[in-house]
Amino acid sequence: MDKIKPRIFIASSVEGLDAAYAIQELLEFSAECTVWDQDVFAPSSVTLLDLIKRAQNSDYGIFVFSFDDTIKIRDTEELTVRDNVVFELGLFIGIIGIANCFIVMPRSNDDIHLPTDLTGITPLKYNAKRADNNLKAALGPSANQIKRALRSFSPPDKQMSDELSQQINAIGLSAFFSSRDDYSKYRASTPSIDR
């Protein structure tokens, strides 16, 4: 019987795709990795709902922080990561837990701005300025650290996972209704998570 591999979602900006693909290749034999541009978002669908579904069906998330944007804070310009990648990290932390999310970013001496809420999370850093421009080799140490973390993976209990997903959906959807009455009407028209 083949060992079940963990499912990993890899997020990045368009500019960070080369690093995302390199990580996917480096983890090929350790996990089933899907980069965000590989059929994650269905045509005519709601991006946020696709991301929630992907998070619920992932065991881990890897978030490639490439510093593509600039931000001005108190008259100082700094490089910063694309905001949607930070949002996706937060979404995944909320659904699969902080221990199952990895930040991968280039080592840099430049003025880099990260949201203060991420202070204390240790990112995996790589040398993006290698003389030979070998991105896979640069990302190798980060990928090896992720592989070591994956050794503790055990497939989740499917029934428990499904029940938890349903509860998360019910809780999350309740925030979108303006009144308890609206939510009650919605709940009356959908299958109960308690049945």
What do these predicted regions represent?
Residues E25, R107-S108, S161:
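Residue-level detector of alpha-helical recognition elements and their boundaries
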Residues M1-G61, I95, S178-R195:
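Conserved N-terminal substructure of TIR/SEFIR domains
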